[in-house]
């Protein structure tokens, strides 16, 4: 029956009528769909470039059908609201409205595809939350949302039930009942006041809907009722710029199709369902792309395969099917052909007939033609399906071709992101060094170990100009041809938008002594440039990673509206100082941009306007951008990091590190060979090998303490906890919704707070509130990854009112402050709740610490954060009573020497690691500390270790800190004291020999382990000691 058709079937059946409607004004419906987030910015740009109205309309319908039934339903409603006459033409309004209960509506705060609480095309209130203040004797006015105040009390209207553990005062109950008619209707409303045990009712004329408001109510089912309860807040501290009061706990109104739901747990459940549904859709798209490319992730491509393929096909071979694209890319990259990526698109010249056939295939959803695959999708699929050895070769050759390299590779199949550290290990940078009084010599250094500032470029919302094209112009010499370091949207052929490569973070390095930079010496010292693909609102993890490691972040967007303000309310003052905004020329005269600059106190160089005109305008644009970059590079607050340094932070954020997986595979292979010792035909030989192996392991505590623990833990690691922490399990806490409350976030880089990044499980710019989502975390879920949209939760007005409070909290923070040894002082308070406390508790900690740090930095610092190498040495202490070790390969090998076999690294192994590895044999810890921890979460384990005073005393003897001026002797004592508690005899034989070299890596970890008597520590001594250690460590990397 026609009345039972799905929305996609309706579109298919009425395609001709819909095309006639769309042809009149396709741009209007296109703009509306984009504003409702039903189509992405890339899809909008692709359709915008199509000049033929009929083709544009046909492609739009196809795109909507591809996105599923929910999108089709919202598209039809959006179409009827934009073109009211379309409903009469098609006669479909009744049929469309019938599907409202079958297609889940995108409710406020729960949908990642729409920022509206109702259907598209409806005029919304100013914010997703309906906020009304009124005095005891005044009427409720929902139409104007006027603010009234009583001398003693103010009220807040919400649709969610009040928190059970909070007190309620004078809770009015407002019941709104209304009916929906075809043309217009009146909406009687009864306000029921419950006060002091008495009930009385008043009619409120202001609740009658106007004409525009009626259009917004047609999507609500008939006879629906919304019960609104209120909580009372009285917080004089939250005073905004406009002089109105703001409140810490803001809640939202949610309308369901049948019965209203007010439980925060149910809302969280719907968020989980949306998240899982989105993940499943991405997995399906990923599998489709791999199928199109004829690739299988379970069958890794090896370098020998590429060589054999090249020999069989020859140098003049051209791809003939989509399955040849990946091989074409690999062949040309291995040959260091700079057209490797271009060949993916320009392998075949299309004539007019071929173009028509291609368009017809797209319209029939046959989109797997070779021209339609985005080259970045091919790159990501190729890297994910390649063996680690091939990945290293591809990375090295891409670097030689001056291509941007994938730093964070999106893994859509597993909903993760991978730091490609191991794949970059073989990249070598040749440098010319001139010794005093001697000739110039060329030296080689691994690129992953070179420390330099990082500048990131991200897109916020819609941007009409190409960010990657601007970067190519910036990095290419003026008199030479523009080199495509980054692929951009101006591609020569018709391609689909990115399918699996959104969230990709690419990186390129600029060296002033390079041959291609000598003619355009813009950067006077080495710098790394990172580029995030896609809208940062959809990739919160990657954006947080870049905020941590970058010395400056450039935001590209057309204009600054509520959505942009909502995001920036999560940025602290020190983070804002590192942010630069590139806007379109239309935003120059806008009032929003002026308010934005005034409120955030942006310097002129932080707000750039990109003119789209002749060559003169383009030259002025580049000059302005270069001036901003010069300001960054000459800043005294530059933070220099290496790719190796980024690994610790990546693990904390739930980002996988590829070399961890490689080490685990290596362990499994070697362990499998040893454990299959009784195989037929090799039984005796295997048995003797295993026996000699166990004998050598028994002797290793005396001869090679570092190697023994490594081998013993390798076998246990095979059956222990997985190496990779899932993103949705024990992940750092994103802003989540709990009972209508949303956690406020302050994006603050870790060094702003006075210590290196990579300290804790949660990000350093995350500032949780007391009402943390314990339930969601208990279920191991997090909704921030690729789904968190701040604009859903906060309006621009809330940002204005919140800004002063948030920025006030960071007023003492200074970007680029040198690390301070706060962790030595915080350990005087060994007990600390699992979740971070309130701001008042943070102030209490601040008073104990005695440093002028911002409030946002206190919760993070209060953990007593281990420094990077300290975290490596401390993490193996946490063992269960059964002897099951929690260890990953990256913890035992945090330095470049870790590439070598264990037996060959005894002399190079830092002494601090040797002590820890011996410590794991005899030092037992509380098994309860294992709860909620993960092997990738170094800081989480360290934090748990601090919470037990006995553990602190057990792990660190008093003589350790009493002689800070003798690091070697104190370190020797630390190494000896740990195993002596259970195995005194091995301890005597493991004393370091005087002739054994002491690598500089071991020294920075000396003052970092927790001290039982840290309150008596002299801060100046500790600070000087840290500075000295930090300098020595910096020379190593």
Curated annotation (Swiss-Prot):
Residues 242-261 have a biased composition (Acidic residues). One of its GO terms (biological process) is regulation of apoptotic process. Residues 994-1012 have a biased composition (Pro residues). Disulfide bonds: none annotated. Residues 1023-1037 have a biased composition (Basic residues). The modification Phosphoserine is found at residues 154, 985. It comes from the Eukaryota. It holds the Pfam family CARD. May be involved in apoptosis. This is Caspase recruitment domain-containing protein 6. It comes from Homo sapiens (Human). The lineage of its organism: Eukaryota, Metazoa, Chordata, Craniata, Vertebrata.
């Amino acid at each position: 029956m026609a009345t039972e058709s799905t929305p996609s079937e309706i579109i298919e059946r009425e395609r001709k009528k819909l095309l006639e409607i769309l042809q009149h004004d396709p741009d209007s419906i296109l703009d509306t769909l984009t504003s409702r987030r039903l189509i992405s910015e890339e899809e909008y740009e692709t359709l915008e470039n199509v000049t033929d109205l009929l083709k544009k309309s046909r492609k739009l319908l196809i795109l909507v059908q591809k996105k599923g039934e929910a999108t089709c339903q919202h598209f039809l409603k959006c179409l009827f609201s934009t073109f009211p006459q379309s409903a009469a033409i098609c006669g479909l309004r009744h049929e469309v409205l019938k599907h409202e209960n079958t297609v889940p509506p995108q409710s406020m705060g729960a949908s990642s595809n729409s920022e509206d609480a109702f259907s598209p095309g409806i005029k919304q209130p100013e914010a997703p939350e309906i906020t009304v203040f009124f005095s005891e004797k005044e009427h409720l006015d929902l139409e104007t949302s006027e603010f009234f105040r009583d001398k003693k009390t103010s009220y807040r209207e919400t649709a969610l039930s009040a928190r059970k553990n909070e007190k309620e005062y004078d809770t009015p109950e407002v019941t709104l009942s209304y009916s929906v008619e075809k043309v217009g209707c009146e909406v009687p409303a009864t306000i029921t006041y419950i006060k002091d045990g008495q009930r009385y009712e008043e009619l409120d004329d202001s609740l009658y809907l106007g004409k525009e408001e009626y259009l917004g109510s047609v999507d609500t089912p008939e006879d629906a009722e919304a019960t609104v309860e209120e909580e009372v807040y009285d917080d004089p501290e939250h005073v905004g710029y406009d002089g109105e009061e703001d409140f810490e706990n803001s809640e939202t109104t949610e309308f369901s199709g049948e019965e209203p739901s007010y439980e925060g747990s149910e809302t969280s459940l719907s968020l989980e369902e949306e998240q899982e549904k989105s993940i499943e859709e991405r997995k399906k798209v990923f599998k489709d792309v791999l199928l199109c490319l004829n690739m299988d992730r379970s069958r890794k491509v090896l370098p020998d395969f590429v060589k054999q393929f090249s020999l069989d096909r020859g140098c003049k071979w051209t791809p003939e099917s989509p399955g040849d694209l990946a091989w074409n890319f690999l062949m040309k990259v291995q040959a260091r052909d700079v057209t490797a990526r271009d060949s993916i698109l320009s392998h075949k010249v299309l004539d007019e007939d071929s173009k028509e056939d291609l368009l017809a295939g797209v319209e029939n959803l046959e989109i797997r033609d070779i021209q339609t695959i985005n080259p970045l999708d091919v790159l990501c699929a190729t890297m994910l399906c390649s063996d680690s050895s091939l990945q290293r070769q591809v990375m090295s050759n891409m670097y030689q071709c001056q291509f941007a390299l994938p730093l964070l590779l999106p893994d859509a199949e597993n909903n993760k992101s991978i730091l490609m550290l191991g794949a970059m290990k073989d990249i070598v940078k040749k440098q010319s060094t001139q010794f005093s009084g001697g000739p110039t010599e060329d030296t080689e250094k691994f690129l992953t170990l070179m420390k330099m500032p990082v500048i990131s470029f991200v897109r916020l919302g819609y941007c009409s100009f190409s960010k990657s094209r601007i970067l190519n112009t910036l990095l290419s010499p003026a008199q030479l041809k523009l080199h495509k370091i980054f692929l951009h949207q101006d591609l020569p052929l018709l391609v689909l938008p990115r399918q699996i490569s959104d969230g990709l973070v690419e990186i390129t390095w600029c060296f002033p002594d390079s041959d291609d930079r000598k003619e355009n010496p813009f950067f006077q010292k080495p710098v790394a440039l990172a580029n995030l693909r896609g809208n940062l609102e959809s990739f919160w993890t990657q954006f947080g990673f870049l905020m941590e490691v970058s010395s400056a972040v450039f935001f590209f967007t057309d204009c600054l509206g509520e959505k942009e303000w909502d995001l920036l309310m999560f940025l602290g003052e020190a983070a804002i100082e590192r942010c630069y905004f590139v806007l379109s020329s239309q935003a120059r005269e806008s009032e929003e941009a002026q308010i934005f600059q005034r409120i955030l106190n942006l310097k002129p160089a932080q707000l750039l306007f990109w003119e789209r005109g002749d060559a003169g305008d383009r030259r002025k644009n580049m000059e302005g951008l270069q001036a901003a970059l010069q300001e960054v590079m000459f800043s005294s607050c530059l933070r220099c990091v290496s790719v190796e340094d980024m690994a610790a932070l990546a693990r904390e954020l739930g980002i996988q590190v590829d070399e961890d997986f490689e080490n685990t595979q290596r362990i499994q292979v070697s362990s499998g060979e040893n454990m299959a010792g009784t195989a037929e035909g090799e039984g005796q030989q295997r048995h003797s090998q295993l026996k000699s192996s166990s004998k050598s392991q028994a002797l290793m505590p005396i001869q090679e303490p570092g190697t023994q623990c490594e081998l013993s833990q390798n076998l246990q690691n095979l059956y222990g906890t997985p190496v990779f922490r899932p993103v949705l399990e024990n992940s750092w806490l994103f802003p989540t919704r709990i009972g209508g409350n949303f956690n406020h976030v302050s994006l603050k880089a870790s060094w702003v707070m006075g210590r290196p990044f990579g300290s804790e499980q949660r990000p350093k710019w995350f500032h949780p509130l007391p009402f943390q989502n314990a339930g969601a975390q208990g279920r191991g879920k997090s909704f921030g990854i690729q789904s968190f949209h701040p604009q859903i939760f906060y309006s621009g007005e809330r940002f204005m009112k919140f800004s002063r409070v948030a920025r006030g909290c960071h007023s003492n923070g200074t970007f680029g402050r040198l690390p301070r040894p706060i962790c030595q002082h915080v350990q005087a308070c060994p007990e600390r709740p699992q979740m971070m406390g309130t701001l008042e508790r943070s102030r209490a900690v601040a008073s104990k610490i005695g440093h002028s740090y911002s409030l946002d930095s206190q919760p993070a610092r209060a953990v007593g954060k281990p420094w990077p190498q300290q975290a490596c040495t401390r993490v193996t202490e946490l063992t269960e009573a059964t002897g099951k070790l929690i260890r990953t390969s990256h913890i035992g090998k945090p330095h470049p020497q870790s590439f070598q076999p264990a037996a060959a690294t005894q002399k190079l192994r830092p002494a601090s690691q040797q002590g820890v590895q011996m410590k794991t044999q005899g030092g037992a810890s509380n098994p309860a500390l294992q709860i909620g921890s993960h092997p990738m979460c170094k800081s989480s384990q360290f934090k748990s270790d601090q919470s037990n005073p006995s553990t602190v005393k057990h792990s660190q003897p008093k003589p350790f800190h009493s002689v800070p001026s003798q690091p070697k002797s104190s370190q020797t004592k630390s190494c000896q004291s740990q195993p002596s508690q259970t195995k005194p005899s091995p301890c005597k034989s493991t004393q370091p020999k005087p002739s054994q070299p002491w690598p500089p890596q071991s020294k920075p970890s000396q003052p970092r382990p927790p001290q039982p008597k840290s309150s008596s520590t002299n801060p100046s001594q500790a600070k000087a000691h840290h500075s000295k250690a930090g300098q020595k460590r910096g020379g190593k990397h």
